[in-house]
């Protein structure tokens, strides 16, 4: 995964460092088995069904129980996390081994044998289970935020998804019947151990797409439930090293060994700890940090290290600042909101608000310049298609409220009042308050409302009905690319392709510009990644001209573990350590 292409190599090579000790992964000798890994944090995942996962926390959890065809290996060297590696696939397809056709539109993937579901009795994972997983991406109840990747890539996926959208989203039987009676031309099980994919056009990043957690195999039992429903969440099935033995929504998870998992069938994961306990409901990063330092907990679930603690921890081997080139957070405008006479649907209003933001204040909130840099583009540095630009400069990154006021007056919309939901964990409240102060200096009032992390992503900003009803006007989500390396589409397409806007879409503001959509298509069909990069740059420029979002920070991830944690290897796409490789001592 994440093949480094021309023009990107220099960017990625700069992302190998970390501040703090943090690299003692192999310093404590041979791994020991046993013990309970204790993880504490704030909010539940927005989706537990692997088909629907869309956040870094959900990605990290899914890795423990839902395997994909390919994946990446956790490492504290950023470069080592980039390559695509086999997971349930037996080998990497190539033109040399005959698994990629001469036209580069046919991929044959052969499955690793011996992988089983945690069913009673155990049952082999087959190619048909992967076909089911791909079909579920477009289910009408809880569709995948990443379905657009495959609609634009796989033959027949668009037609399949259109038909699936007409099925009753509350009827598990009807959805199951649709899947049985229809098929995606581009995803076929040749036999129990062989998958054949047919692409609309050659796609140099197709293997990257097959590492994404929502492409995991789905057991036949999942057809009994409405996807990601409460009932489904209580009946997850595993083919990874752990299984979810107990789940209390919004409160806790208990993961225990999956007895059907075998190390010799899994090249990416290990299994050392006996149990993994995840305790939720703790919004204060200070409280979480205190528990880890006192040895009451081992890892934070969804909280970075508190800003106030960073100076004293810089030389602590348990602390690290890990590179996660991302847009975290960014300010998104609900372009569909009817509030203020539909003001946010007007480009001139959004352009005016670009000048409001004091990025220097936000950098202080998250931990200073070693943790975050100001961001002015849709695509952050270290990602394919990045080109430095600053269309809306302000003195010392501190904002220009006078210009913001002037442009709002000129646009005919002074005195806006904007509904602003914010996440309650980590420093998100402080970020929201800082942005509210910036807007107030421009004469814009904000109505702040606390919104738990799970609800924030799962419903508030990802539900089109909420957007069209004006239940929110601005929000500050974050975006970590789904993969690194040859990853141009992992930012522009999910966040700004207006053609895939709908339930669970990550194009939260409903932005839709035919010019940008056309540039996305051009990039996806470009013969080489280097050519695609030019189209992504053009799309970035157009999106910023439209002021669809306000990029705020390119932020690294601060992370800390307890004294008893060893083999702490980082996964940038999950913004956390790989739970399956950790082991514990009694220290």
What is the predicted role of each segment?
Residues 30, 351, 363-366, 447-458, ...:
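Extracytoplasmic/peripheral linker and loop segments enriched in polar/acidic and small residues
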Residues 91-156, 196, 291, 343-345:
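Aromatic- and charge-enriched surface segment that lines or borders ligand/interaction sites
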Residues 40-100, 237:
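N-terminal lobe/hinge region of extracytoplasmic solute-binding protein
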Residues 242, 340, 370-407, 425-430:
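Structural transition elements
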Residues 559-587:
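Long beta-strand-rich cores associated with HINT superfamily self-processing modules
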Residues 245-256, 265, 277-340, 365:
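Extracellular/periplasmic solute-recognition and catalytic clefts
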Residues 73-77, 167-194, 198-277, 402, ...:
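Gly/Pro-rich hinge or "lid" segments in bacterial periplasmic/extracellular proteins
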Residues 38, 125-133, 192-202, 240-241, ...:
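Alpha-helical secondary-structure segments
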């Amino acid at each position: 995964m994440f093949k480094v292409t021309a023009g990107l190599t220099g960017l990625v090579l700069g992302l190998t460092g970390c501040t703090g000790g943090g690299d003692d992964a192999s310093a404590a000798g041979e791994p020991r088995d046993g013990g309970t890994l204790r993880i504490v944090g704030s909010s539940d995942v927005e989706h537990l069904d692997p088909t629907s996962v869309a956040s870094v926390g959900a990605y990290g959890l899914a890795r423990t129980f839902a395997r994909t065809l390919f994946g990446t290996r956790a490492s504290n060297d950023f470069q080592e996390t980039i390559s695509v590696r086999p997971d349930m696939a037996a080998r990497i397809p190539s033109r040399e081994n005959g698994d990629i056709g001469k036209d580069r539109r046919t991929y044959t993937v052969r499955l690793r044998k011996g992988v089983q579901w945690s069913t009673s009795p155990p049952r082999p994972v087959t190619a048909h289970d992967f076909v089911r997983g791909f079909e579920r991406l477009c289910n009408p109840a809880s569709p995948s935020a990443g379905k657009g990747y495959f609609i634009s890539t796989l033959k027949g996926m668009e037609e399949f998804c259109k038909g699936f959208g007409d099925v009753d989203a509350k009827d598990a039987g009807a959805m199951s019947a649709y899947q049985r009676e229809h098929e995606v031309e581009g995803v076929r099980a040749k036999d129990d151990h062989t998958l054949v994919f047919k692409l609309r056009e050659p796609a140099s990043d197709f293997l990257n797409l097959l590492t994404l957690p929502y492409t995991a195999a789905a057991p036949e039992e999942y057809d009994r439930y409405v996807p990601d429903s409460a009932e489904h969440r209580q009946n997850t099935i595993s083919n990874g090293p752990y299984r979810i033995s107990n789940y209390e929504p919004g409160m806790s998870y208990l993961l225990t060994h999956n007895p059907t998992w075998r190390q010799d069938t899994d090249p990416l994961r290990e299994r050392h700890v006996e149990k993994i306990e995840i305790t939720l409901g703790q919004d204060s990063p200070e409280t979480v940090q205190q528990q880890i330092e006192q040895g009451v907990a081992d890892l934070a679930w969804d909280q970075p290290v508190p800003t106030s603690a960073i100076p004293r921890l810089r030389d602590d081997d348990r602390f690290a600042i890990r590179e996660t080139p991302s847009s975290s957070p960014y300010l998104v405008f609900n372009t569909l909101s009817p509030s203020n006479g539909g003001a946010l649907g007007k480009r001139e209003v959004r352009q005016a608000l670009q000048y409001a933001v004091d990025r220097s204040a936000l950098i202080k909130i998250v931990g200073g310049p070693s943790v975050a840099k100001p961001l002015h583009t849709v695509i952050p540095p270290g990602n394919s298609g990045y080109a430095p630009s600053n269309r809306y400069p302000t003195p010392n990154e501190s904002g220009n409220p006078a210009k913001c006021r002037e442009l709002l007056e000129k646009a005919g919309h002074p005195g806006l009042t904007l509904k602003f939901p914010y996440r309650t964990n980590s420093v998100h409240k402080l970020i929201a308050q800082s942005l509210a102060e910036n807007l107030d200096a421009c004469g814009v009032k904000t109505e702040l409302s606390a919104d738990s992390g799970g609800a924030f992503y799962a419903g508030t900003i990802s539900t089109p009905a909420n957007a069209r009803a004006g239940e929110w006007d601005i929000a500050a989500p974050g975006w970590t690319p789904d993969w690194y390396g040859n990853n141009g589409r992992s930012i522009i397409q999910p966040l700004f392709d207006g053609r895939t806007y709908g339930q669970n879409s990550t194009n939260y503001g409903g932005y839709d510009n035919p010019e940008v959509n056309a540039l996305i298509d051009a990039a996806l069909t470009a013969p080489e990644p280097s050519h695609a990069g030019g189209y992504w740059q053009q799309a970035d420029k157009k999106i910023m001209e439209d002021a669809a979002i306000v990029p705020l920070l390119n932020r690294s991830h601060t992370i800390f573990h307890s004294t008893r944690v060893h083999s702490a290897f980082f996964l940038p796409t999950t913004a956390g350590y790989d739970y399956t490789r950790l082991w514990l001592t009694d220290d």
